[in-house]
Amino acid sequence: MNHRHFQPVFAFLITLAAAAEPEHHSADIVVYGDSPSSISAAIEAAENNTDVLLVSPVRHFGGIIANGLGSQDVDKRAGNAEPIGGLTREFFIRIARTYDHDATSPRYKFHSSRAGQAIDHWLAEKNILVLRNKRISEKPGSVTKEGGCITGFTCEDGTRISGKVFIDGTIEGDLMAFSGVSYTWGREGNDQYGETVGGVINPTLEQQFHFKVDPYNIPGDPSSGTIFGVQNEPVGTHGSADKSAMGFCLRLPLTKDPENKIPVTAPEGYNARDYELYRRFLAAGGGNDWLDGPGNKNDDRKAKLIDLGSWHELSGNFYGRNHGYPDGTYAERKRIYEEHRGYTQGLIHFLSTDPSVPVEIRAEWSQWGLCKDEFTDNGGWPRMLYLRSTRRMVSDYVITEADVIARPASSQCGRTLQPAPPVEDPIGVAWWFVDLHAARTVIKEGRVYNEGAFINYDNYAPFGIPYRSIIPKRADCTNLLVPSALSSSYAGYGALRLEWTYMVLGQSAGAAAVIALDKNLPVQDVPYPDLAAHLVSRGQKITVSKAGN
């Protein structure tokens, strides 16, 4: 037999087998996510000469910082820049250097494209192995564990990732959830942790309509159904639990510059009746600095707005339209993103063109458009929503409202909440208040009513974030750290949900992972004195000198 005739066949079969073999990557420390905590965790591990792999479910790193949130909550009401040290401070200095190469101070207001540029350069400089568009598979068994330790996970495209210590840097807590770690979402009732604003907030005073807006399709007729954007459900009892989440939005950079502007046209399927709530609000005499138009009316024709935020009774937050997101499938999250994007596009078109909108508002909005030089692969639209609250781990320490307040707080039901004592294992400092946006737009006494907003500017203090809040219960997993979807109540998370806080916790998670790896310890057994000493040596701030409010 002439075996030479079979050689091409054998070579072809070998090639097919190689092509069918799934991609596999392994590292001592695996960081999963695209958020700021993912970046700082990976860089902290790399700068400690550790074998680290950074796996992102999407193409672009930075999370919402690289997707529209260009105005950071730093040195606004709180004067809270003091806790920003270590890699977090370095990151904001690196952003400043994309504007001024010689900058030595951090910059907290910037364009998203500059943040993305700074992140990509930083990761390349550290020679970190980066995998993009590698999302964990939703199929059962995609995360494998042995003896309480994660051994690896499989991505949607079949790529296999293995490691010794894992860090879940996603805001959504996907690796955490798929690993079987205890978590929750939505709003706990006040009774669960003895809080005063843990669940439904009734009455809601913040972000509330101060003009009566009729909620029914035929004004005054409940049988006619509700106008779009109003949920026909009861407000609920103060302090009761539910699965709501504060409203999401798109954080939009916008411009007036004709050479850089993408006009915002009506989306497919646009129907002006979907914005009846806005029409009635304006007709009743309502208004705010969001609806009046982006930026400053005196901005010149080259003006570029860094970040169109939403924190008003009526703006770009679509209360009640996101409740399926936190624990939803990837398909459900995509649907919610697309709904928010389409509705935002339609809203801008409505405010720019609809005859019911006051002429001065139409004139202002019609000058603005999306930016050609932002999100160039997505038509000028941010690639993600601003996720104010999703999943939250439930661990041995749950950060609650008591950790945030400086003085006793009282609730409508007569409960008085005492401040929690300082924690013994701080790995960073949170310096913000309980900051909850509305979660639902419902009906109360025959009028449109926003429920769920609570912002306490007057009773908060900087507080140490305990190491225990970023590690799971020992029975759940012993080699995972969770710096973004950390263990907290809904109210407690309201003081944690700042991007710079995530980045602080990411660095601390990276440092703890290195120690756990070097000492061959479960993350629950990392010696806190060793971790604290290391963090301080790296410029991390784990205590502050100021007392707060």
Describe each region flagged by the PLM.
Residues Q7-A17:
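Bacterial N-terminal signal peptides
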Residues P140-R160:
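Conserved beta-strand-loop-beta-strand element in the redox core of flavoprotein oxidoreductases
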Residues T50-D51, S56-S142, T184, Q192-G194, ...:
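Conserved N-terminal/central alpha/beta ligand/cofactor-binding core
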Residues S38:
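N-terminal Rossmann-fold NAD(P) dinucleotide-binding loop
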Residues T159-V165, G169-N549:
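Flavin (FAD/FMN)-binding glycine-rich loop and adjacent Rossmann-like elements that form
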Residues H24-S35:
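Beta1/beta-strand and adjacent pyrophosphate-binding region of the FAD-binding site
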Residues A45:
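Aromatic pocket-lining residues of Rossmann-like dinucleotide-binding sites
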Residues L16-H24:
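Bacterial Sec-dependent signal peptides at the C-terminal "C-region" and cleavage site
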